[in-house]
């Protein structure tokens, strides 16, 4: 089995056992408000669900324990007005056999296998566009499907857990008009037999109403 095949197997195995869910935002639970290494690992393994920061952080640990070079990265979703949300989505970049791959086990849709990060590369129905930020050594990748931008990935390792903690706190204190995931209960499980995400609740079931 190739290294890429092994990586995909790990990813599918994790997706199959852990659902994406933002239910904790609506539940009022308080013990989850601190992004602590052991608390997050225990939470994900116990409940078998989580949001991007929880799921991708735990999978990052799993990859590291398997001696697979990887690092956490910030990604941003685009608003309808063209700006990007301040809250970032957490994901992973893996370095394998001289190539980079985008890994996301905490989105709840689209991502079912490692996505090769090369300019104009296509993995399944995911297309990647490479960008170099002017006057910096930082690069970004625009990840889209059907010509719709899903995420802008900043290729810069996020090594400080305090930065994730700050974003985590910001998410749980955000209002519905400030971030899409704070408006609806969104829960998905991954079916490895069909390679599809299955909704656990009706899509876009509104829990909190806001003017946005």
UniProtKB/Swiss-Prot annotation:
It is an enzyme of class 2 (transferase). One of its GO terms (molecular function) is acetyltransferase activity. Belongs to the arylamine N-acetyltransferase family. The keyword Transferase applies. The keyword Kinase does not apply. This is Uncharacterized acetyltransferase R151. It comes from Acanthamoeba polyphaga mimivirus (APMV). Keywords: Acyltransferase, Transferase. Its EC number is 2.3.1.-. It comes from the Viruses. The active site is at 52 (acyl-thioester intermediate), 89, 104.
